[in-house]
Amino acid sequence: MTILKIDEIINPNKQKLTPIKEKQDIIIPDIIDKNIPRRNGSIVVFTGSGGSGKTSTLLNMFKSKKQYRGIFDNIYYFCPLASYLSISNHPFKKLENLYHELTVENLENIYNQLISKKEAYEQYLEKKKEKQRNKNKKKPKEQFVEYLDDEQESETEDEDEITEIQYSCIIIDDFANDLKNNDIEKQLNKMLIKARHLCTMFIFTLQSYLYFPKMLRKQITYAIIFKPKSIAEWNSITDELIHYNKEDSLKLFNYIFDEPYSTFGYDTIENKVYKNFNLLKIENN
């Protein structure tokens, strides 16, 4: 069958789409560098062979005030013990949520913590609305004393109460073999689907893009790729992410990886391509 012509019949009753305002931000607040992943619920992968610079780049981003330093309320860091001990003066050495094993139990516990934090914030908002509704019902003159009491009461908050959105980040550093475990993959998939609603960014580091399970790759929002070991691997990456043919893929490879530690970045939401976090403007025929 060959399509000759397509006609569209307009629905006269069609409603205009109005985006629903959500409580969480689309962009995580206070990140100055606009060329790094900033979207709430980002699923980020850093890939590169051993010694490529991926872990150094990631850790430096959490040390930079223009990037991720001081941005997240909660950081959960998974890193094999040997890899962790190999880094002198590790930036996450004082981190409370530090894990050396990637298990379903650990992931499930974190997932439940994140849900509890979100529910606590929702309860705070509801309580705040309820107080406002009660104030609006009162008559200012007749209930002046009670109104003042309410004002004083509203200023007193529980120390443990979550009164602002908490943004979290889960980093899974160099656990490619564990990601092959079906139960771990399913638990992660469950969490990635909810990443935006949980206000959580996920960051994975792997030695190859293809080590990341295909089910999870479908949810990537930002990829940061260090020089692949072969053109065949690079072609697989560009074919899956940006749908380039082999000729254009090779041109991009030669342009980006012209010096050590260069990176290819791709924002899958906005379809933007980066070299070393510099935006590239690519002209096509």
What are these regions (language model features)?
Residues 92, 240, 279-282:
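Short intrinsically disordered coil segments
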Residues 28-33, 41-65, 69-70, 80-84, ...:
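Conserved P-loop NTPase motor cores
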Residues 1-33, 82:
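N-terminal pre-Walker A segment at the start of P-loop NTPase domains
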Residues 95-105:
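Nucleotide-state-sensitive switch-loop elements of NTP-binding domains
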Residues 86-96:
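Short, aromatic/basic amphipathic alpha-helical patches
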Residues 75:
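An amphipathic, basic-hydrophobic helix/alpha-beta surface used to engage anionic
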